[in-house]
Amino acid sequence: MSFTLTVIGGGHAGLEAAFIASKLGLKVNLLVLDPNHVGSCPCNPAIGGPAKGIVTREIDVLGGMQGKAADATALQYKLLNSSKGPAVQAIRAQIDKIAYQKWFRQQIDQTPNIELIAGEAVDILESNGKVKGVVLADGSELASDAVIVTTGTYLKAKTYCGSLSKEEGPDRAKRSEYLSTNLIKRGFKTLRLKTGTPPRILRESLDFSQMAVEANTTPHLAFSFTTKNYLPLEQQVICHLIHTNPQIHQLILANLKQSAVFNGSIKANGPLYCPSIEDKVFRFQDKERHQIFVEPESLSLETVYLAGFSTSFPPEVQEHIVRLLPGFKNARFQKYGYAIEYDAFSSIQLKSTLETKLIQNLYFAGQINGTSGYEEAAGQGLIAGINAALKLQRKPEFVLQRNEAYLGVMINDLVTKEISDPYRLLTSRAEHRLWLRNDNLQERLIEKSRALGLVEADVYANYLEQQQKKKQLIDYLQTTTVGQIAALKLNFKNTAQTLFDFTKRAEIKLVDLVQLLPKRFDLDVQSLNQIDIDIKYAGYIKKSEKYFKSLNNLSSVKIPLKLNYHKVPNLASEAIVKLSKIRPTDLSVASQVAGINFNDILAIKHFLDNHE
């Protein structure tokens, strides 16, 4: 039986939703305001970063597109936090944003069951609490078995640059006028959020000799496990690093009231972890400088992006400030920075599948849920697309737990916690970040992906081969002692210790140890490092697994959406209020809600057991 899905929006969330649903057999209508903006990167020309880069790789293991697109259009890679522990390391890629868009358009053209449609969605068609399609601005209708709304920052969007404001989307694009109004009429709770972007400067007007070079020094980096050819270090573009100075800070503070963020024009909440330059200078007046990265946007563009310098100052103030930066004395502007506010919707109105609780087969993904970032959006689009397909095909839902993926952490946060400012994924949000690492994506997720039919055969075959090689090395380490290795027995007293336990020492690196072994193992550096990390952190990871095993069992206990918590004996009043508002779908989700303790969970479980 054939099913049709309509995805509203062709940004990072919409694209993942469309492609994964098409892979799972659905016919997809990809409805966009402007086909020329499909896959656009209206803010930073980069994919990845702390936690975010791990999400991009999780998306890849689960059959998604973002990692492949980034690898196909990368200009430079970096392994972030390489000097720190493995839990916080992640890949970030500078991408060619024009090539990135072209890559996605080519993929759409080559996918028969995705139809790109230009039009504006103004309302949802609904019957008996179930979505039936989409109403377009011209009065036409798209019949659909499911709908995923991925409207990004376009809902009633408004841009600000000084005292000037315009009703428009990012990059002067047409905004979505009516959809959020009609969703509100259907009972959805909205909130107003804000983000911003820096000015774009013509690179030929800059003196790069006054800037520090930021080059990649780590070879063999890629997001996707399907990427065969790594971008050579010598072919990677150079980014630059500069800093603000006290003179700039004085100018910013003297002109604060000209910024739309400070003059009262903008009422919406902005991102806590990505503030504007004026906000940073105002909030951290004890800091003498703030770092700014100068990044190319595309090989086909003459502009650079000032990462860390988003602003809503008027053009003349932006010019004065920017020209005080090192190397920017003669800077010429291609586009001024601006702030943008938009409608989003409270994500606690969603199930863990990202289906709305109010209307069946209607899903929200991306910035409409109050998140920020391309990676967060793409991850939600992927999960929404998978679950839309599974539900229509009457298959079990796909929900990742907090100990399985950053995607699980993010979605659990979204559906259990009220969002007041744009949500950004951070390693600190993951209580089990020692397990949710950049190096063990396949071990965590590939079998789940294979169960969905989303893993390429050659990728899975290579994974099994690598697992067998890893097992051979681990078996050797567990059965061989220090005393059996000539290069070790003279330098270490405990010769009866196995090499496995010997590797647990912080100063021992497995990549060096294998060079001393008489037996050779055909494993690359990445695989050796992963084994090394697993050995060193095995104790911590075991504790983590034991703790979450109890929560995973709770996920099998479903909670009726209409449960009257006032009727649950011995349930704390705080739990009644919070659970009545959030409406968790199972006990595992309920246990993650702030203020809910184990006794509350036991009370609910006992009540459900006696009222089946």
From Swiss-Prot:
SMART domains: GIDA_assoc_3 (SM01228). It holds the Pfam family GIDA. Coiled coil: none annotated. NCBIfam families: mnmG_gidA. Homodimer. Heterotetramer of two MnmE and two MnmG subunits. NAD-binding protein involved in the addition of a carboxymethylaminomethyl (cmnm) group at the wobble position (U34) of certain tRNAs, forming tRNA-cmnm(5)s(2)U34. PANTHER family: GLUCOSE INHIBITED DIVISION PROTEIN A, PROTEIN MTO1 HOMOLOG, MITOCHONDRIAL. The lineage of its organism: Bacteria, Bacillati, Mycoplasmatota, Mycoplasmoidales, Mycoplasmoidaceae. The keyword NAD applies. GO terms for cellular component: cytosol. Its cofactor is FAD. NAD(+) binds at residues 270-284. Keywords: Cytoplasm, FAD, Flavoprotein, NAD, tRNA processing. The gene is mnmG. This is tRNA uridine 5-carboxymethylaminomethyl modification enzyme MnmG.
